[in-house]
């Protein structure tokens, strides 16, 4: 990622209204809950020691994101639209500049941002994640869609086993992409009608899926969160 030059655009600092969220009256309580009273400060060098330290950390991350958004993602956006993705051996391949965007956000450490530090994440509150998402969306709403689907990992963190967490969360924090596989031909917003069935294969130690998913955003992702019966 290039060193920020004087007068370069920044989609965070150029839009001070985004920072308003950091001044919300409930923000201090939100940070305390997310940081569990700052217990990580004894284990991780980059963990905040108090509320003010956490806010400064968030501002730095937002500033880095604003720099990447304005000076890499936005300049790539027209090329991404013109080239578009394509099929290759049955696999959807991103436009070349989308790969550049992914490389930039990976190098900036902007993946798995809401996950705990022990898995390689930044332990950011959802408020800050939403601010990052807004900054990236200002540069390219299409790439924001790809990037923000990392939030699917929150479901696994909340409901998955520790074995699953150890297996998948570090991969997302390292920049692997995700998708949320919900929609079917006869089940869109009415998810009670989902028919795809998951059956555990004890011999192979894996789940077998029988059914159809359709219109899956970022459906070529590395990791899929699948809703099944």
Where are these regions (language model features)?
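Short coil/turn segments at secondary-structure boundaries
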Residues: 33-38, 76-86, 115-117, 144-149, ...
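Internal maturation/activation junctions in enzymes
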Residues: 148-149, 160-207
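Conserved, non-catalytic sequence blocks in retroelement Pol enzymes and Pol-derived host proteins
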Residues: 90-93, 120-121, 186-189
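Extended, charge-enriched "interface" segments that sit outside catalytic cores
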Residues: 4-88, 92
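Internal helix-loop-helix
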Residues: 66-67, 96-174, 217-219
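A short core secondary-structure module
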Residues: 206, 210-229
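Short, surface-exposed charged micro-motifs
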Residues: 102, 195-199, 215
